[in-house]
């Protein structure tokens, strides 16, 4: 092979390589398009209200859980256009059994489609939704709804205390999980809400907490008292002092492993400094 022929061959290879990214980009249509999820809405058969925290499960154990708006984004491409059995379960809610005793429904999901599943309420209380934790509207947001909802930065938290104080509802939670590390907050976290926003009576639940936060925006500890172990608060109440000004007071406990209370007392929360 002459020098000229080798030079021309090398030039052809370089030209082909330079076009490779654009050739790969062309492969994105139409057979490699992203499959849109199918929207499943879980509703109370009697009221039509959305029902959060209902689990649907496929025959190969894919599980999806409805969010505060009762929505599920079923995003399994292999199920689109396929008759699919979904086991349906949720505390206090159910669907009728079939002849073999299975509680579920058969649906045909379609990309971008919508399916409604009605559940029967077996308990007295109607579930309104989760108040805390992450992803309250995660499924809805995957489907393009509730895009104005902002995450709190809290993954989950322990039992709640609350009290009315200076015209607002004050909330305090125990051990609180944060997204950045397995060890979160262990000296109570807290927030306030306007009284009118505190007790929603219609779903979906959207409580607008104003959390007490660190400068880096993570929820802060409310009651990091001296001594080993977590600090837990209970019995929150707003009381007038000698000067007539109301103070937020509580009982506190200090806890050592495994779960030993070694100190108990009363405290006044100075919310100005939190």
Segments (PLM) and residue ranges:
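Beta-strand-rich domain onsets/edges
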Residues: 23-38, 45
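Extracellular beta-sheet/turn segments enriched in Thr/Pro/Gly and aliphatic residues
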Residues: 26-32, 101-124
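Short, ordered, surface-exposed loop/turn motifs in non-cytosolic proteins
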Residues: 35-38, 46-60
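Short, acidic Ser/Thr/Gly-rich low-complexity loop/linker segments typical of extracellular
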Residues: 60-76
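A short, solvent-exposed loop/turn motif at the edges and junctions
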Residues: 79-107
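N-terminal regions that are enriched for targeting/export leaders
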Residues: 118-177, 184-187, 192, 197-225, ...
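Hydrophobic core segments of beta-strands in well-ordered, beta-rich domains
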Residues: 160-182, 232-257, 263
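Conserved small/polar residues in nucleotide/adenosyl-binding loops
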Residues: 272-274
């Amino acid at each position: 092979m002459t020098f000229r022929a080798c030079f021309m061959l090398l030039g052809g290879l370089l030209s082909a390589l330079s076009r490779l990214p654009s050739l790969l980009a062309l492969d994105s249509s139409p057979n490699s398009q992203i499959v849109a999820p199918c929207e499943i809405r879980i509703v109370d058969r009697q009221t039509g209200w959305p029902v959060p925290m209902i689990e649907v499960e496929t025959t190969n154990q894919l599980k999806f859980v409805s969010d505060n708006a009762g929505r599920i984004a079923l995003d399994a491409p292999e199920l689109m256009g396929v008759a699919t059995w979904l086991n349906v379960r949720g505390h206090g809610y159910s669907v009728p059994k079939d002849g073999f005793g299975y509680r579920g429904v058969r649906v045909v999901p379609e990309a971008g489609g919508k399916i409604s599943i009605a559940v029967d309420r077996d308990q007295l209380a109607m579930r309104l939704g989760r108040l805390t934790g992450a992803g309250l509207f995660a499924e809805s947001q995957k489907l393009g709804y509730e895009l104005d909802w902002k995450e709190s930065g809290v993954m989950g938290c322990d039992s709640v205390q609350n009290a009315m104080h200076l015209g607002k509802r004050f909330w305090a939670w125990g051990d609180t999980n944060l997204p950045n590390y397995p060890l979160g907050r262990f000296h109570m976290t807290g927030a306030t809400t306007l009284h009118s926003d505190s007790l929603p009576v219609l779903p979906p639940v959207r409580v607008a907490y104003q959390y007490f936060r660190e400068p880096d925006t993570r929820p802060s500890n409310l009651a990091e008292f001296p001594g080993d172990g977590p600090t837990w608060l209970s019995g929150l109440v707003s009381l007038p002092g000698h000067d007539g000004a109301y103070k937020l007071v509580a009982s506190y406990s200090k806890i050592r492993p495994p779960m030993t209370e070694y100190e108990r007392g009363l405290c006044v929360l100075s919310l100005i400094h939190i």
